[in-house]
C-alpha cells in the first residue's frame, strides 16, 4: 500500500539553491525512498515563467515519487496543508545596502510567510529557514505564527556543521562519516562557533588527535565561518548545491532520525546554555520520532563562553533590529 503523499513547500523556487534542491526532494532524498511528495512552489510573480521551466524539467525526470506540483506566487496557496516548508527565498543584500535595511526587507517577507503558515499549514509543519539572515528570519516567521508550536521553526546551521566536519576530517585524516559529537553554536554567520571539544573519530578524541589550539583558533574557526565568502570569491556565485544538500540533511534527519548522532540545528532557545528564550540559536541535537532534542549539560569553558556570547550578541542585535516590525 503506497503512503499518502506529503506536501513540501519550497520558496524561492526559481533560485539556484532550489534548482539543486527540488530534484533531490522528488527523488526521495528528503523524506525517504517510499514517501510520495507533492511540491508546492512559491516565487515572485515575475519568476513564475522560470519556475514553470524547472517544473518542465521535473516532469522530464519522471520521478516515481513525485505525485504533483503546485506553482504559485501566493504564500497561502504554497503553504496549504504543508507538512514541510523550506523557506529558501530571501532578499539578498544588494550593493550599498545597510544590514538594517536587509533585516527590514526580510522581515517584510517572513512576517507574511509566517502568518500564511499560521493560517493554512499543517499544525505539525516542519519549517526550515535557509534564506539569510536565517536565524533571525526563522525568529520572525515563528513570531508571526502564534498558533503553531515554536519548536516547528528552525534555521539551517547544517551547512556550517558539514563544513566543519569536512575540515576536521582533512586535518585528522579520519573519514568524515566517522566523526561524531561535533557542535556548531549560534548564528549562521561568520560569528558562529564550531566546537569539536567533545568530538570523536572511530572512538578517539579529536581534540587529542589534532592537539593544536592555534589551528583551532586561527585556522579552523575562521575557515568554517568564512567558507561562504571563500566560495563566492572562487566561483563568482554563492554556494547553492552544498546549501541544498545541507537543507536535505537537516530535514531528513529531523523526520527520519539521526540514530543517536549529533547534528546541529538552529532552534528556539529554552533558556539553556545562557541563551535567552526564543532566540533561534544553533545547538547540537539528536533527532528521533520526528522530534529534535538538544544535547544538555555540556561543559562550557571560558573560550567557548566568549565565542557563544559573541554570536549571541549578534543575534540579539538582529532581534532588536526587527522588534518594531513584529506584533508580538
From Swiss-Prot:
Record gene name: mdh
A family per Pfam: Ldh_1_N
GO molecular function per UniProt: L-malate dehydrogenase (NAD+) activity
An annotated GO BP: tricarboxylic acid cycle
HAMAP family: Malate_dehydrog_2
Protein name according to UniProt: Malate dehydrogenase
Matching InterPro entries: L-lactate/malate_DH, Lactate/malate_DH_C, Lactate/malate_DH_N, Lactate_DH/Glyco_Ohase_4_C, Malate_DH_type2, NAD(P)-bd_dom_sf
Active site residues per record: 188 (proton acceptor)
Function: Catalyzes the reversible oxidation of malate to oxaloacetate.
Catalytic activity: (S)-malate + NAD(+) = oxaloacetate + NADH + H(+)
Assigned EC number: 1.1.1.37
Top-level taxonomic group: Bacteria
Family: Belongs to the LDH/MDH superfamily. MDH type 2 family.
Residues reported in the UniProt entry to bind substrate: 93, 99, 132, 163
CDD domains: MDH_chloroplast-like (cd01338)
Keywords noted in UniProt: NAD, Oxidoreductase, Tricarboxylic acid cycle
Amino acid at each position: 500500500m503506497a503512503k499518502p503523499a506529503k506536501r513540501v513547500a519550497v520558496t524561492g523556487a526559481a533560485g539556484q539553491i532550489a534548482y539543486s534542491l527540488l530534484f533531490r526532494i522528488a527523488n526521495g532524498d528528503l523524506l525517504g525512498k517510499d514517501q510520495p511528495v507533492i511540491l508546492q512552489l512559491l516565487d515572485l510573480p515575475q519568476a513564475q515563467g522560470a519556475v514553470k521551466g524547472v517544473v518542465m524539467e521535473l516532469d522530464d525526470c519522471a520521478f516515481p515519487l513525485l505525485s504533483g506540483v503546485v506553482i504559485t506566487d501566493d504564500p497561502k496557496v504554497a503553504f496549504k496543508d504543508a507538512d514541510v516548508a523550506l523557506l529558501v527565498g530571501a532578499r539578498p543584500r544588494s550593493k550599498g545596502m545597510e544590514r538594517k535595511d536587509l533585516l527590514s526587507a526580510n522581515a517584510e517577507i517572513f512576517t507574511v510567510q509566517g502568518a500564511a503558515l499560521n493560517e493554512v499549514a499543517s499544525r505539525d509543519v516542519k519549517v526550515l529557514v535557509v534564506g539569510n539572515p536565517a536565524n533571525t528570519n526563522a525568529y520572525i516567521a515563528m513570531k508571526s505564527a502564534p498558533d503553531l508550536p515554536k519548536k516547528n521553526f528552525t534555521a539551517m546551521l547544517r551547512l556550517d556543521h558539514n563544513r566543519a566536519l569536512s575540515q576536521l576530517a582533512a586535518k585528522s585524516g579520519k573519514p568524515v562519516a566517522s566523526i561524531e559529537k561535533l557542535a556548531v553554536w549560534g548564528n549562521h554567520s561568520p560569528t558562529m562557533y564550531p566546537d569539536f571539544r567533545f568530538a570523536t573519530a572511530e572512538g578517539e578524541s579529536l581534540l587529542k588527535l589534532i592537539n593544536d589550539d592555534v589551528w583551532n583558533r586561527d585556522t579552523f574557526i575562521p575557515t568554517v565561518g568564512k567558507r561562504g565568502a571563500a566560495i563566492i570569491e572562487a566561483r563568482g556565485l554563492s554556494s547553492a548545491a552544498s546549501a541544498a544538500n545541507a537543507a536535505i540533511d537537516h530535514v531528513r534527519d529531523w523526520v527520519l532520525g539521526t540514530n543517536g548522532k549529533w547534528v546541529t540545528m538552529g532552534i528556539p532557545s529554552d533558556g539553556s546554555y545562557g541563551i535567552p528564550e526564543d532566540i533561534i540559536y544553533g545547538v547540537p541535537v539528536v533527532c528521533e520520532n520526528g522530534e529534535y532534542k538538544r544535547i544538555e549539560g555540556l561543559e562550557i569553558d571560558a573560550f567557548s563562553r566568549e565565542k557563544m556570547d559573541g554570536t549571541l550578541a549578534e543575534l540579539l542585535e538582529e532581534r532588536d533590529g526587527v522588534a518594531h516590525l513584529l506584533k508580538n
